[in-house]
Regions:
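Conserved beta-loop-beta element that borders a ligand/cofactor-binding pocket
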Residues: 4-26
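Conserved beta-strand segments of alpha/beta enzyme cores
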Residues: 14-16, 72, 138
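Conserved C-terminal active-site "lid" loop/helix of NAD(P)H-dependent oxidoreductases
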Residues: 83-89, 113-138
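Mid/C-terminal beta-alpha module of Rossmann-like enzyme folds, strongest
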Residues: 61, 65-116, 149
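A generic structural signal for alpha->beta connector loops
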Residues: 12-14, 98, 136
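Amphipathic terminal alpha-helices
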Residues: 142-153
Length: 153
């Protein structure tokens, strides 16, 4: 809530700040599954959280926030917590990958290659959409499995 106060110029205007996880679309899933098929290592730690959201839920929440006159900060991430490892293994499952493993780049190499940007890969936030759910928004794809099933068709 503090972060939206700096944008408040007029008292009668509602401000919505969206904190959006990795947006899942068909093109992204196809690209990630190609990386896994070629056994290209994934940057980050396998135990880190991987906040994600289906693109249709972003559109759905924006429409919901307008029609419900919401204001404040909202986390737009899937309602189930997902680790890096379970995220990529789920992609393998839904894309029917023949490679049974996911390789992760060691943290020191990630820091070397990406510098300060490495924090994005190494420290996945444990983000839950509590306020989003409390706003009565109903996710179209609340679980990773439902999102991937839709994007794998």
């Amino acid at each position: 809530e503090k972060s939206t106060k700096i944008f408040r110029v007029f008292e009668d205007i509602d401000i919505i700040q969206l904190r959006i996880g990795v947006v899942l679309r068909k093109k992204i899933i196809n690209l990630l599954s190609l990386n896994l098929l070629l056994s290209i290592p994934v940057p980050g730690r396998k135990n880190n959280y991987f906040p994600w959201i289906h693109v249709d839920d972003i559109v759905g929440f924006v429409n919901h926030s307008i029609s419900s006159n919401l204001n404040g900060a909202f986390n737009l991430v899937g309602s189930e917590l997902t680790s890096h490892e379970s995220f990529f293994k789920s992609i393998q499952k839904y894309k029917k990958s023949i490679i049974p493993w996911v390789l992760f780049i060691p943290p020191n190499l990630v820091k070397l290659f990406f510098g300060k940007m490495s924090e994005m890969f190494l420290y996945g936030p444990k983000t839950k959409p509590i306020k989003t759910l409390n706003s009565k928004y109903k996710f179209k794809y609340p679980t990773l499995q439902e999102a991937l099933l839709n994007l794998s068709e």
